[in-house]
């Protein structure tokens, strides 16, 4: 087992240094354990000072479960959401209490997935129903801008050299290691406040030599002394020791930003006019060398630039000032960021307005001055806001004052009345349309009935014509074998169909026929009688 794990603190009270920070964390954890939700914690400080250890000890002492994720390793939106986003909204299945979510190195979210990763972290913080502890190495990182307002920030300081030295002595005593006190103190000092690094270095020395001396320190490399940029500026302005300043200038940052930061804070620290003049002369020489480096692409000029802005500015003062001076960021960057915000806002507004006005955003940008006049009237401003669908921040581009709530209320009531009238008109129109449809249906039905009756009359007339025609044809064609009864029936049917002029003829004809038939019948009877008599 490595010594870092072997001699790691077993409870929160065992952690070295940062007593105030530990007390704040304990208060936060107590409130969560009592069921009072708190803002997520954001622990900020250099590596190796116990942030992660404290987070895990809090999880062990106060919560039922701990889930950890390194945000800099899992940078995309989907990965962060799936790994910790879902866990933040659900309670533990197997334990009753809250589960602690630990997100390490949130300031390390970078690369192409940056926007997605940062968005996932922000959404997790916003929607979480579980306690969250976030950790960052650089408290001044721009990547924490959106996270800081949502969290309770706690700053951690480096562990004091004496505290590290005492811990190393305890480890040596337990491991039965002989040591030179001066060598051990040098090791503690060179760890630069990083307790973890000091313990790891001690273990590396012991693996090579069972005794710690000044010579044994050569086994390990001096801890990379990359400074925080604000510590660098403090060293340049406060110190007169060239070696100390040179050590402080070992900072991983862009020279143009560093030169601006030093130049901004010179008049805040230096009080004598001649000191300020000399310091700015050094800044000017540094700037000349930076310009040469960028112009010729020969970056060896950078070392001269660092020499002038570091040792040169430090040497400009006759004595150090024992006062507190707050280091501020260059005003030029503040102004640029403000103007960038304004530019972005202007771009958003012109994009929205161009869609409605059917003109290019660039052309519209020239006309924004005239809209400022239109936005002076409250009611007109409200109408324009609604028409272009502008937010309150976007309205500020045209007017400093917010549109009064009374105007909004008045316009809303007016709009509601207009909507009601419009609805009534729509209902009326619907009724009119329905009546029109009914009338159309009625006229259509009437037309259909007319057409049908006309068709029926035509069919009836055609039928009667066909029957009369068939009767005429039957009369003209003679029948060969027709009985007298048939003839009589035919004659009767003929009598019915014939006109009144022929009715007298037919009646006389029938009477003659009747007489003939009666005579024949009499003859038959007489024959029959004669036969019987015979």
Curated annotation (Swiss-Prot):
GO terms for biological process? DNA replication
Q: Which GO terms describe its molecular function?
A: ATP binding; ATP hydrolysis activity; DNA clamp loader activity
Residue ranges, annotated region (Disordered): 444-534
Which intervals carry biased composition (Basic residues)? 517-527
User: Iron as a keyword?
Assistant: no
Give start-end positions of Low complexity composition bias: 488-510
Q: Which domain of life is it from?
A: Archaea
Q: Where is the signal peptide?
A: none
Compositional bias annotation for Basic and acidic residues: 444-463
InterPro entries, sorted: AAA+_ATPase, ATPase_AAA_core, P-loop_NTPase, Rep_factor-C_lsu, RFC_lid
Which Gene3D superfamilies is this protein grouped with?
1.10.8.60, P-loop containing nucleotide triphosphate hydrolases
Q: How does it assemble?
A: Heteromultimer composed of small subunits (RfcS) and large subunits (RfcL).
Q: Which NCBIfam families match?
A: PRK04195.1-5 (NF003229), PRK04195.2-3 (NF003233)
Similarity field: Belongs to the activator 1 small subunits family. RfcL subfamily.
Q: What is this protein called?
A: Replication factor C large subunit
Gene designation:
rfcL
């Amino acid at each position: 087992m490595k010594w870092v794990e072997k001699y790691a603190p077993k409870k929160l009270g065992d952690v070295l240094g940062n007593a105030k920070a530990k007390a704040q964390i304990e208060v936060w954890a107590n409130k969560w354990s009592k069921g009072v939700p708190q803002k997520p914690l954001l622990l900020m400080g250099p590596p190796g000072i116990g942030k992660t250890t404290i987070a895990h000890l809090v999880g062990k002492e106060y919560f039922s479960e701990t889930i950890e994720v390194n945000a800099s390793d899992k940078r995309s939106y989907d990965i962060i959401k799936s790994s910790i986003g879902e866990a933040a909204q659900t309670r533990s299945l197997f334990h009753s209490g809250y589960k602690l979510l630990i997100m390490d190195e949130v300031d390390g979210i970078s690369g192409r997935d940056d926007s997605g990763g940062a968005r996932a972290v922000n959404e997790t913080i916003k929607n979480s129903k579980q306690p969250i502890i976030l950790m960052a190495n650089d408290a001044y990182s721009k990547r924490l801008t959106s996270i800081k307002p949502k969290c309770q920030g706690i700053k951690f300081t480096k562990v004091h050299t004496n505290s590290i030295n005492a811990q190393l002595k305890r480890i040596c005593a337990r491991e039965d290691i002989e040591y030179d006190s001066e060598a051990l103190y040098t090791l503690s000092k060179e760890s630069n406040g990083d307790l973890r690094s000091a313990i790891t270095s001690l273990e590396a020395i012991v693996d090579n030599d069972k005794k710690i001396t000044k010579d044994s320190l050569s086994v390990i490399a001096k801890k990379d002394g990359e400074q925080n940029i604000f510590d660098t500026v403090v060293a340049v302005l406060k110190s007169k020791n060239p070696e100390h300043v040179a050590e402080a200038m070992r900072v991983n940052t862009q020279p143009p930003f560093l030169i601006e930061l030093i130049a901004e804070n010179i008049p805040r620290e230096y009080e004598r006019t001649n000191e300020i003049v000399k310091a700015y002369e050094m800044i000017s020489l540094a700037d000349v060398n930076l310009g040469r480096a960028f112009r010729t692409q020969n970056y060896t000029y950078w070392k001269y630039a660092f020499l002038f802005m570091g040792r040169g500015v430090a040497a400009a003062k006759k004595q150090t000032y024992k006062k507190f001076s707050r280091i501020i960021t260059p005003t030029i960057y503040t102004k640029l960021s403000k103007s960038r915000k304004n530019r972005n806002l202007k771009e958003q507004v012109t994009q929205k307005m161009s869609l409605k006005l059917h003109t290019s955003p660039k052309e519209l940008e020239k006309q924004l001055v005239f809209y400022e006049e239109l936005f002076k009237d409250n009611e007109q401003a409200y109408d324009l806001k609604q028409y272009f669908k502008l937010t309150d921040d976007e309205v500020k581009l045209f007017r400093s004052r917010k549109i009064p709530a009374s105007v909004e209320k008045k316009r809303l009531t007016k709009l509601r009345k207009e909507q009601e009238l419009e609805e009534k008109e729509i209902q009326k129109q619907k009724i009119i349309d329905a009546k029109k449809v009914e009338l159309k249906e009625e006229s259509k039905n009437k037309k259909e009935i007319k057409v049908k009756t006309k068709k029926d009359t035509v069919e009836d007339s055609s039928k009667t014509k066909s029957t009369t025609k068939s009767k005429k044809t039957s009369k003209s064609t003679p029948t060969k074998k027709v009985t007298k009864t048939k003839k009589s029936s035919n004659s009767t049917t003929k009598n019915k169909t014939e006109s009144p002029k022929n009715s007298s003829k037919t009646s006389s004809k029938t009477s003659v026929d009747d007489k003939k038939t009666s005579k024949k019948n009499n003859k038959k009877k007489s024959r029959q009688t004669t036969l019987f008599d015979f």
